[in-house]
From Swiss-Prot:
GO terms for biological process: neuron projection morphogenesis; regulation of muscle contraction; signal transduction. It comes from Homo sapiens. Residues 389-401, 743-755, 840-849 have a biased composition (Polar residues). It is found in: Cytoplasm, Cytoskeleton; Cytoplasm, Cytoskeleton, Stress fiber. The modification Phosphoserine is found at S29, S839, S947. This is Protein phosphatase 1 regulatory subunit 12B. PP1 comprises a catalytic subunit, PPP1CA, PPP1CB or PPP1CC, and one or several targeting or regulatory subunits. PPP1R12B mediates binding to myosin. Isoform 3 and isoform 4 bind PPP1R12A, but not isoform 1 of PPP1R12B itself. Binds IL16.
Amino acid sequence: MAELEHLGGKRAESARMRRAEQLRRWRGSLTEQEPAERRGAGRQPLTRRGSPRVRFEDGAVFLAACSSGDTDEVRKLLARGADINTVNVDGLTALHQACIDENLDMVKFLVENRANVNQQDNEGWTPLHAAASCGYLNIAEYFINHGASVGIVNSEGEVPSDLAEEPAMKDLLLEQVKKQGVDLEQSRKEEEQQMLQDARQWLNSGKIEDVRQARSGATALHVAAAKGYSEVLRLLIQAGYELNVQDYDGWTPLHAAAHWGVKEACSILAEALCDMDIRNKLGQTPFDVADEGLVEHLELLQKKQNVLRSEKETRNKLIESDLNSKIQSGFFKNKEKMLYEEETPKSQEMEEENKESSSSSSEEEEGEDEASESETEKEADKKPEAFVNHSNSESKSSITEQIPAPAQNTFSASSARRFSSGLFNKPEEPKDESPSSWRLGLRKTGSHNMLSEVANSREPIRDRGSSIYRSSSSPRISALLDNKDKERENKSYISSLAPRKLNSTSDIEEKENRESAVNLVRSGSYTRQLWRDEAKGNEIPQTIAPSTYVSTYLKRTPHKSQADTTAEKTADNVSSSTPLCVITNRPLPSTANGVTATPVLSITGTDSSVEAREKRRSYLTPVRDEEAESLRKARSRQARQTRRSTQGVTLTDLQEAERTFSRSRAERQAQEQPREKPTDTEGLEGSPEKHEPSAVPATEAGEGQQPWGRSLDEEPICHRLRCPAQPDKPTTPASPSTSRPSLYTSSHLLWTNRFSVPDSESSETTTNTTTAKEMDKNENEEADLDEQSSKRLSIRERRRPKERRRGTGINFWTKDEDETDGSEEVKETWHERLSRLESGGSNPTTSDSYGDRASARARREAREARLATLTSRVEEDSNRDYKKLYESALTENQKLKTKLQEAQLELADIKSKLEKVAQQKQEKTSDRSSVLEMEKRERRALERKMSEMEEEMKVLTELKSDNQRLKDENGALIRVISKLSK
């Protein structure tokens, strides 16, 4: 007891010492030094008892009364003017609090006194949100019955049904949503849509009329950043909203986006170069208030922002330099514009002059042709040189040349000039003045080889006047190709009716069309070089200027005699006004010297055709190998020829031959003047005359000449077909050979003029007087010729397009067909005789011509014998028993079907076995997996038990230690009690 009293005295002493220390500190404080009046002025008035009186605001008193459920006090406060919708610091009203407290009586009392059932707190929660979250079904029903909205969203974009956890509450709210027809998605996006509309309006008006929130000072940019309205954020930034605007607490939009973890909003603000180091009133940066998972993203955005800021600075410097350069270059542009305006009247005058010269040259060519190539060059040289107006703002264009064409051409020079007049301005230049260096670079040529040729030929051209180089990409090539396709269609129709011979019309046309197509594809410089080499090889002087190297509508022959020129003019007038197939049926008028245009061409036909064939061979493109098709067609053709030739020579054939021979004799008597030597000289010089435009120069006189067979075949074909006249549709040549006068001559004139010595009527009888030796020799020659012809035939058939091939079906014999075939055979014999006369020399004798006729007859008989053997083979093939073949094939097919069915059955059996094996394997694997799963579960259960046991062991050790400690304390207390008891 004495010890306890001693301890109590010590405690009292220490308490007195602490109190004394407090008094000492009070005496030295500033409060103790203030006057007593000031200290008492700020205190509450004293009551009677002397204690101060505390006063609360009316709103706080009202909320406290509602919370306590004192309805009488609430009525008194409402009577004194208290606001029933007053809120506390969190925005909660009395209705919110009554709903949270589940006080249905107070809820009814407040609603009856006109409390707002849709009032939202600071987080956007309405009383219905609170009731749905707490699960108070009766309060929620009461709110709904009294007009509470089920579509209001809180700050998180949640409607009351999203907060409901109990199924009954969720069903109630969803049913009400359907009943009221509320679109929840639209409700969630309503705020964003409203902000989007306002942002667009501000962007269009250029004026931002935003109102800060009264409580926090937040702006629309803060709300868009915090809620992740990316589109609204972009529009506000585009409208010029201040990126670093701060609310009342100093928070920027980046603070809000970082705090609420909106990554996209942070990226948009950072890319817009907002300040990422700005601090709020508490000294916090966006990194300090950011969500933990967003800090790294903000650091990356800061690095990216530094790069963007540096790029923007360099871009601004470049823009300033560009503006300076544009200001400096404005002066030069204005000067060049003035120069351009001065040159415009000159270009208009030059266009008018070009049109006049084009029309005059076209009319002149329709009336007559030029006498030599020099006249063509002079007219071409009279045309002004074209240049392109150059300025800094216009792209350079290549110069094109317009050359007047004949009236038949669908693409005339005047239309070409109209086409190019809108694209080019052509100021007139002095003719003796060389163009400047920068204008020379605008010339367009076929290839770089053209430049050297232009440089070499510039001096002589400048003497005659400024020349125009035609562009290799001239639009006239397309017109030429179109006309060539039309002509090919007509010729293919003719060739289908003509007899199939080695040198038939269709074959020659096929070869020449292919050659012309290849030549058209080549560039201008290549063809120009080719013509130059061939001219040197023929040793004929060439005076063609480079200005007309692709002028396919103006080529004329440079070397002609006066008589040839007259014949050319006459034939040209006829060809320009009469269609091709009509001209073929009439002889041309004679010239002043009595020489027709027909024998002029008949001298060098065969030799030139051989030479042309040898030269053309290198220009043909490789073709596909269709050996099977060619063999089939050759076999069918031989069968048809066998059917024709085995009939023998009929009376109709003999009558036709007599009529032809008598007609030729009468014409030969009408032309009694000997023309052998003039024919030779004129044929060498004037044969390359062109009555239609051609792409081949004049130096290839004999090269493009076609064989006799072409003219001989075309004459009877045109007689039979009676080609309609087409004056409105000109025939443009596709190859050199189609532009030769051989198309305009009559076949009987051709072979009549071959014979310089008149034949006697005994030519019919001498045909049958050949010897056996000559027969054998001719048969050997015929075998060689047939072998060569078969090879060429297969090559020709491989080249022929499918649309031009004849049908190979069964032919039915008719009388008309037999007569036609007979006439064709007679014409073929005449063709062979003429070719022998032609190869025999320039002065053939009558006996040689008779021998050729006999040899031709012998060859024809040998051919008939060979074809007869082929026919017998075909008949043997036709005698096969196709019924047996069909039956054997049918039985074989049936056997194969049975084998196929057996194989299918075996395959199905094997598949079923494989499926069974796979199923067994799957079952085994599933059993194994189930066993393994059970083992894993048992292992996990044992591991859990072991862990629980270990925890229990730990608790047990702790309990043991606690028990030991309690025992020790108990012993100590016992000892103390024992001492005190003493």
